[in-house]
Amino acid sequence: MSSHREEKVRRIAAPDIAARKGGTPIVCLTAYTAPVAELLDEHCDLLLVGDSVGMVVHGLPNTVGVTLDMMILHGQAVMRGSRRAMVVVDMPFGSYEGAPETAYDNAARLMKETGAQAVKVESGPTVIDTIQYLVKRGIPVMGHVGLRPQAVLVDGGFKAKGKAGEERRRILEEARATADAGAFAVVVEGVAEGLAREITEAIEVPTIGIGASAGCDGQILVTDDMLGLFDWTPKFVRRYGDLRGEIGKAVAAYAEDVRARRFPGPAEIYFAKAG
């Protein structure tokens, strides 16, 4: 029997992220599959199994059609592929906006079946009590203010927020209320840079920016956007790769080799043993 024992790695948890307020910026990316989670794990503090999976992986027009079962399936995959990074799973549209008891049942199922360390909800006046309800019952919650993808049908599209006075005040108050309700961190998405800084200074938990400000306590991007897998890049994304181009080249080379009967070659096929 081998004497080798795999070294146990302690996974980052909500208190670790909360303690990073004002410190070294927190590195976050989205993950939906085990292989990608494995690649990101070494470099990230937090992996978000975002409901953006509906658009990125399943081709939906927005996140409204994402189901709890979909989030559980992808959450399980990301947990299998990662060892160190904290894994947070989005609660999809319709799973938490009603009675807090229903939200708890859905959140508890999500955490039990995935093994994730926390859930994320989009904040708002009707959700603050639910955040408090979940946290009091042992479920770590990450909030989300500003541009809220699940509210896209109400808001009329993916538009930057917080440029006008009343909207700016409302988003700031939602962030404060979310932190006061017990969220361990708050995603701040698609808001004016000055507002993102103001939120970061106003609340005692870390802010995770996406299209917000370098002054946030951490940053997150959709991994597929950052790697250049799509031909359209949102304004707030910096592309660190061109995987769309690289994949296109690789597939074109494969197709050419197949049509020319250069693949498979001697190195990729099996031969019967002599005798």
From Swiss-Prot:
Subunit structure: Homodecamer; pentamer of dimers.
GO molecular function: 3-methyl-2-oxobutanoate hydroxymethyltransferase activity; magnesium ion binding
Localization: Cytoplasm
Role of this protein: Catalyzes the reversible reaction in which hydroxymethyl group from 5,10-methylenetetrahydrofolate is transferred onto alpha-ketoisovalerate to form ketopantoate.
Cofactor: how and how many bound: Binds 1 Mg(2+) ion per subunit.
Binding site for Mg(2+): 51, 90, 122
Binding residues annotated for 3-methyl-2-oxobutanoate, in chain numbering: 51-52, 90, 120
UniProt similarity note: Belongs to the PanB family.
Swiss-Prot/TrEMBL catalytic activity: 3-methyl-2-oxobutanoate + (6R)-5,10-methylene-5,6,7,8-tetrahydrofolate + H2O = 2-dehydropantoate + (6S)-5,6,7,8-tetrahydrofolate
Protein name: 3-methyl-2-oxobutanoate hydroxymethyltransferase
Annotated pathway: Cofactor biosynthesis; (R)-pantothenate biosynthesis; (R)-pantoate from 3-methyl-2-oxobutanoate: step 1/2
InterPro entries the UniProt entry points to: Pantoate_hydroxy_MeTrfase, Pyrv/PenolPyrv_kinase-like_dom, Pyrv_kinase-like_dom_sf
Organism: Phenylobacterium zucineum (strain HLK1)
GO biological process annotation, one example: pantothenate biosynthetic process
Catalytic residues identified in the record: 189 (proton acceptor)
Keywords on record: Cytoplasm, Magnesium, Metal-binding, Pantothenate biosynthesis, Transferase
Cofactors that this protein relies on: Mg(2+)
Pfam families: Pantoate_transf (PF02548)
Gene Ontology terms: cellular component: cytoplasm
EC number: 2.1.2.11
UniProt KW Cytoplasm keyword: yes
